[in-house]
Amino acid sequence: MKGKEYPFGYVEFLHSQQQNEYDNIEHDMFPIIDLYTDDDVTDIFINEYNNIWIVKDGKNIKVNNCFESESALSAWISLIAKTLKQPYMKTGDFKERDEIHPILDARFPNGSRIMATSPLITPKGTSVSLRKVPKKILTGDELIGFDYLTPEMMAYLQKAIRQKKNIVFVGNTGSGKTTLVRVMILFMDRGIRIITVEDTAELNVIDHFPLGIAFEAPVRKNVAADLATCITATKRAQPDCVVVGEIRTPTAMYAYYDVCTGGTVGNITTMHATSPKKAIIKMAIYLMKAGGFSFELAEQLIREEVDIIVQCRRDPEYGRRVSEITEVHDTELRSVFSFDKETQTFRDHR
């Protein structure tokens, strides 16, 4: 089977038309190809065709790159959607009763994520958020070297992993949650049966675990398998631990809670939250909605299953940091480590 290496990954072609489509994606990507191939650039944000930003070394930087026009950018996104078979706007077989999809959420062959919106919901024009897949998995020592956390914090988390604690990593977009989870997973015994579940595969660690399985639940036309369905399916695969890429819905939270109470230990998940306390509240609300519990009961159930919350933060002032590590107890949240923004130092509260 014929294949070709592109900047966005290697592709094996089923037919010549498929190669033409990928060739066109690469060709039309020319305005940002230098940004995409820069190993120091982690994210590319296209706010409008002529308003492009990147994240480099943890900092937001405006660049002079631009597409020729709004129509050129829009055509590139439509081509990506068609080639990757993702719903976006009106497809070729569109019927009047069909829904229009103004948001594209897709993954390049190498795992880079691309999210785009049409002018239907971003009136100034097509917007794009492109998160590049890292070329190498960072080590714990490298994260310490980047001042993302301290050796003491890393040792604490490593011990928690080996004690099979259930850990939730929370933070804003681009705060390093996935990177840190990847490091934590590689602290695990390579002989365990680990199952990862993600909307879009980003962890890419299963090759290190001979018994491991990776589930993915991307949006696909006529495919009835969302994140909650995949999480539930892990129970029948006899996992030793389950890692869920990100919980964003009540049904996914309920399915994850069900896994945690079913005898599987050392589980990990991530979600968006601005503090450990708000993470508990958010998880409780999700569980309340999906399970029909009162909020008080849902919060109690969450506290019983979550052992540690790791707060990650991306801040324009000081970049990426683990801003807090908190132990979850029945009646309190106990801060173990925190980052002092005023003094720019980490504190050990033990």
Outline where the language-model segments fall.
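Walker A (P-loop) phosphate-binding loop of P-loop NTPases
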Residues: G174
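N-terminal anchoring/assembly modules that precede and organize ATP-driven motor systems
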Residues: M1-K62
